[in-house]
Amino acid sequence: KKFPNVNLIQGDFKGFGWTKNHAASFATNDWILIIDSDEVVDTELLAELKNKKLDEKIVYKLNFKAFYKDIQVKHCGWNNQKIKRLYNKNITKYNSNDVHEDIITDSLKIEELKGNVEHYSYHTISEFIIKADRYSTLFASNNAGKKSSSPVKAFFNGIYSFFRTYILKQGFRDGYVGLVIAFSHMVTNFYKYIKLYEFNKELKK
């Protein structure tokens, strides 16, 4: 009620790709900027969005700064991620992936905008646990019958994920936050593939 230009739409969640395309169908403007509820556009990006002359044949990507609570995460693979978020809905859309959805860019150019999106993705340890369960289930559901898995594969995917995040991507430089993130990556990847293993077994019955 305080923001008459805002239209709140509620509906079923059918995976990230489908849900974002469904939400875009309600937009009255052709240009779609995807900003999640835990993300904030900084002043530089806001100015860029106001002044930029957009080209419908270009999909625009944004730079992301990640935070845990109010602590900026500068390593772990979270720092300065470039993610496609601005597009013309008459030209393209998101793919239908349940998780790891992305804007389709066939024959389109990609350009990065100035400024940043500040992503306050987690505020408690419990949120890591909840998201690990949710994302691993979506991954397993989306890949059941398409990808193979086994307990051994799940184990080594988890171990490598920790090593990659904490050592190769220097998560140790983020202090205890880096350890939390690396362990969360390990758990998420283990559950992704062990759930996929169970889903595939169910399909064979």
Where are the predicted features?
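Acidic donor-binding segment of Leloir-type glycosyltransferases
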Residues: K1-Q10, K14, D42, L46-K52
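Catalytic-site signature of metal-activated, phosphate-bearing donor transferases
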Residues: W18-A24, W31, I35, D42-E202
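Catalytic metal- and UDP-sugar-binding loop of GT-A-like glycosyltransferases, i.e.
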Residues: G11, I35-S37
